[in-house]
């Protein structure tokens, strides 16, 4: 591959994304498909583009991404985290700007496990007094 390529790993919920960045003209490829083909929802596309728009690099970099696991929002969040890490590897001076926007911190929230005797993680069975 390219010699001037930068890499970042992103994770969110049950998703993990590997992001490769190289100078180009703004092409985003996710699992061999375009951004528009991969994410049907506009909100997911916006989440993916956020770090690039913040640092004005939308038209300057090509992104090659592989993502596994989780659902749509988890994958979009993992990609955003991966892009952020790759951008910091590309140019360390972008870190403070990305940190201010909250993209550097890994969102550690996970689905809470279902407990025995409950219907869901916290939802109790209906209580009948009589």
UniProtKB/Swiss-Prot annotation:
Q: Which UniProt keywords apply?
A: Ribonucleoprotein, Ribosomal protein
Identification of the protein by name:
Small ribosomal subunit protein uS9
Q: Give the species this sequence originates from.
A: Shigella sonnei (strain Ss046)
Q: Provide a GO biological process annotation.
A: translation
Provide a GO CC annotation, any one.
cytosolic small ribosomal subunit
| Protein family membership | Belongs to the universal ribosomal protein uS9 family.
Leader sequence residues: none
Organism superkingdom: Bacteria
MF terms from GO for this chain are: RNA binding; structural constituent of ribosome
Keyword Transmembrane helix carried by entry: no
InterPro entries from the entry?
Ribosomal_Su5_D2-typ_SF, Ribosomal_uS9, Ribosomal_uS9_bac/plastid, Ribosomal_uS9_CS, Ribsml_uS5_D2-typ_fold_subgr
User: Do you know which Pfam families this protein is assigned to?
Assistant: Ribosomal_S9
């Amino acid at each position: 591959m390219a010699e001037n390529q930068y890499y970042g790993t992103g994770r969110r919920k049950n998703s993990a994304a590997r992001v490769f960045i190289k100078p180009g003209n703004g092409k985003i490829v996710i699992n061999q498909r375009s951004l528009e083909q991969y994410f049907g929802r506009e909100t997911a596309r916006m989440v993916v583009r956020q770090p690039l728009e913040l640092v004005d690099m939308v038209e300057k970099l090509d992104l090659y991404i592989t993502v596994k696991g989780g659902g749509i929002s988890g994958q979009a969040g993992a990609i955003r985290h991966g892009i952020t890490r790759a951008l910091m590897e590309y140019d360390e001076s972008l870190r403070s700007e990305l940190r201010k926007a909250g993209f550097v911190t890994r969102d550690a929230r996970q689905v809470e496990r279902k407990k025995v005797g409950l219907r869901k993680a916290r939802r109790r069975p209906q209580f009948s007094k009589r």
